[in-house]
Regions:
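N-terminal, positively charged nucleic-acid-binding surface of large information/translation enzymes
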Residues: 1-181
Length: 181
């Protein structure tokens, strides 16, 4: 048996039912999972839903539902997508599950102990619907409101304290690993 191979779809935001983009990403991931299995790799293929954030909260409020109840309903449609498309995923994870929280807590504790994360602040123009930050040159003022030039979605200025991973510390080792593998 060849080396292990891990593949995942994005963990989708269940702010609305799945669409063609979700199907496309899932099918591409499934293709590579099946290919690697045929090539003799031990494959673990994961998909699931990421159930947090402003977009989820706003979608739940718009539906007059509790965010978890809203996610329960929409997440089920993503799980059904796997069956409908006959995907070969080994697991479906929801970020609201205890097993996910436990794994994240364990990883967090390891990173904190090794001083790989730090508390800092970030700020910028953020679009909830696009789930993206934009630079000043990527937004415009339309009738007194700031919007993204590329999507037309409203943006709002946000400033938050958050934890960050020291990715730049790992740049050279990662580039070396990629070039060798």
């Amino acid at each position: 048996m060849k080396d292990n191979f891990y593949i995942t779809t994005p963990i989708y935001y269940p702010s609305a039912k799945p669409h063609m983009g979700h199907a496309y990403s899932s099918i591409v991931a499934d293709f590579f999972a099946r290919l690697k299995r045929i090539q003799g790799h031990k494959v673990f293929f994961l998909t699931g839903t990421d159930e947090h954030g402003q977009k989820i909260q706003r979608a739940a409020e718009k539906s007059n539902k509790d965010p978890l109840k809203f996610c329960d309903e929409i997440s089920k449609t993503f799980r059904n997508l796997s069956s409908l498309l006959n995907l070969s995923n080994d697991d479906f994870i929801r970020t609201t599950e205890k097993r996910h929280a436990s794994a994240v807590t364990n990883l967090w504790n390891i990173l904190e102990k090794k001083k790989e994360i730090y508390l800092s602040k970030y700020s910028g123009w953020y679009s909830v619907s696009d789930e993206a930050f934009y630079n000043e040159d990527e937004i415009e003022d339309l009738e007194g409101k700031k919007i993204s030039k590329s999507s037309g979605s409203p943006v709002e200025w946000v400033e938050e304290e958050s934890y960050f991973f020291k990715l730049s510390k790992w740049q050279e080792p990662l580039l070396k690993f990629y070039s060798e593998n």
